[in-house]
Amino acid sequence: MTLDVSIIIPERVFWEKRVEEIILPTLSGQMGVLKDHIPILTGLDIGIILVRQKSSSDWTSLVVTGGFALINSNNVTILVNEAEFGSEINVEQAQISYNSSKHALEMNKDIKRKFELTLNLKKARARFQVTQLKK
């Protein structure tokens, strides 16, 4: 038996597959999900989702920008604002974005702006980290 995974963004169903295993970036750390997982609703952080498809040792990686995951009866429904396949991210652009986001946060003196810059850095870090998984 496998898991039926749906990743939904505001505009559409982004991705649907039957998979063996999924690792989610929850607000309290990474959470692995296999078949017959207990039902749970969890918040997702900005980060990387890793998916292993049936009868494969290869993992598919996606960057998501927070949301929620509902796990119930071997169905995993993921609702996020943005999703992007790791394989579609340009390594050089991700590195530049990560470095500039890090620099902007370090140079910032405005407390109110720090929150936005921190979110930008988390997204840029996830995008850069996922490019390193492809190697």
Swiss-Prot record:
Topology versus the membrane: Peripheral membrane protein
Pfam family name, one: ATP-synt_DE_N
TM stretches of this protein: none
Signal sequence, renumbered to the chain: none
Highest taxon, organism lineage: Eukaryota
Broad class of where this protein is predominantly found: plastid
UniProt GO MF annotations: ATP binding; proton-transporting ATP synthase activity, rotational mechanism
Stored InterPro entries: ATP_synth_F1_dsu/esu, ATP_synth_F1_dsu/esu_N, ATPsynth_dsu/esu_N
Claim: Transport is one of the keywords in the record: yes
Localization of this protein: Plastid, Chloroplast thylakoid membrane
Keyword list, A-Z: ATP synthesis, CF(1), Chloroplast, Hydrogen ion transport, Ion transport, Membrane, Plastid, Thylakoid, Transport
Cellular component GO terms, alphabetical: chloroplast thylakoid membrane; proton-transporting ATP synthase complex
Known partners and oligomeric status: F-type ATPases have 2 components, CF(1) - the catalytic core - and CF(0) - the membrane proton channel. CF(1) has five subunits: alpha(3), beta(3), gamma(1), delta(1), epsilon(1). CF(0) has three main subunits: a, b and c.
Role summary: Produces ATP from ADP in the presence of a proton gradient across the membrane.
UniProt record similarity statement: Belongs to the ATPase epsilon chain family.
Name of the protein in question: ATP synthase epsilon chain, chloroplastic
Protein species of origin: Euglena gracilis
